[in-house]
Amino acid sequence: MGVSGLQRRLFWLLVVGFCRMISASAIVFADEPASSNASSSALQTATSLQQEPDAASPPPKIKWEYYAFVDVGYLLDFNHPANHLFRDRSTTFKVDELDLNMAAAGAKKLPSENSRWGMEFAVQAGKDSKNFGFSATAANVSGADALRHFGLADISYLAPLGKGLTIQAGLFNSLIGYDSLYAKDNFTYTRPWGGDYTPYLMFGVNASYPFSKKITATVFVINDYFHLAHPNSVPSFGGQFADLAATRITFKETVLYGPHQANTALEFWRFFSDSILEWKKDRLTLAFEYQVGTEKVDLPGTPRALWMSAQLPAHRVVHGPWSVTARPEIAWDRDGRWTGSAQLIKALTTTLEYRFPYRKTNTIARLEYRLDDSRGAGGGFFRGAEISPGIFALTPTQHLLILGLIFGFDSQ
């Protein structure tokens, strides 16, 4: 039996084990009152909002948080490409093999009124740290192979101005996008197309100000659309408006404007918009994200490139540690400027998740099915054996069965 056969057998053994875990835990949680789930979800929603300190209580202690996690996954591709690649992807791009997709460790301290300086620092390794942050149309920054191992590296300061102006500088989490680079922070194991082609991290400086409990505005200056790309030496600029319109609804609009090619004339600057609407109630979360980008390309005739994407994830905590997610999405790269291939992609991802928190650890197991369909001049996914050196057949449809296992530690 070859290596691929052993890996596939291992995958199915893991799936069987996952299913046995389902049946065993179903007995444990059968008598659990549903109200506990609602209370847990309500608590999670409440803690995501800024809480007013009690004037009579002593000031909170200064706390550092330490965390680490490992993320292992297997993507079974029914096309079985010989190169083991999920085409045009920067995360979870290896199929038909068991991979360490991410391992990371970090520490952070958030700024507060009694300790105004904050810091975040994290290092990472794994398949998902290999290709993210790079551009399909621009050169890499010097030392990119080492810099990709930094997940966060920033300092922040809460200035005593009005309601509190927070300034952050360094390598910080992107203000664009609904999904994180880390699968543990998302509803699904694999990221949407719009997530892989927008920045997961930003390098630069940002300043945010809460005008009220519901409205926060942020402005930022960053080195480039992708922090590990270096098309030129001119920074990009942007801003975000966040509105907690109601108790259950959040709206965010983020725009970015800057050059992403060697010619930095204003007519060639890229404009990008990311709009997110999220609704939460008890154990149910619904979200809608729409992205659109455009720029003139410095080529004969100065053609205008256009791309857009949208996703509609729905997440439901079913019972106890069990939850399900469905995410339909669409991505259109008219000119191949965004993904590197001119294509229209439609995808559907469904996920079954089990979480097992124990003391300061959390284990997440996900079983996921994903269907992608790519049409167009540059569309398609790899299939089968190599036709000739470096050449593989393409097919418009790809079916994936995915098993992901994430184990994490958090000092909080």
Predicted feature descriptions by range:
Residues 1-10:
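N-terminal secretory signal peptides that target proteins for export/translocation
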Residues 18, 22-87, 95, 404, ...:
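N-terminal periplasmic/intermembrane-space "pro-region" immediately following the signal or transit peptide
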Residues 57, 106-110, 156-158, 166, ...:
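Transmembrane beta-barrel domains of outer membrane proteins
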Residues 77-97, 128-242, 252-259:
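Surface-exposed coil loops of outer-membrane beta-barrel proteins
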Residues 89-92, 129-132, 138-146, 245, ...:
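Outer-membrane beta-barrel pore domains
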Residues 92-128, 307, 312-324:
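Glycine- and aromatic-enriched membrane insertion/assembly motifs of diderm outer-membrane
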Residues 97, 113-114, 127, 197-202, ...:
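Solvent-exposed loop/turn segments connecting transmembrane beta-strands
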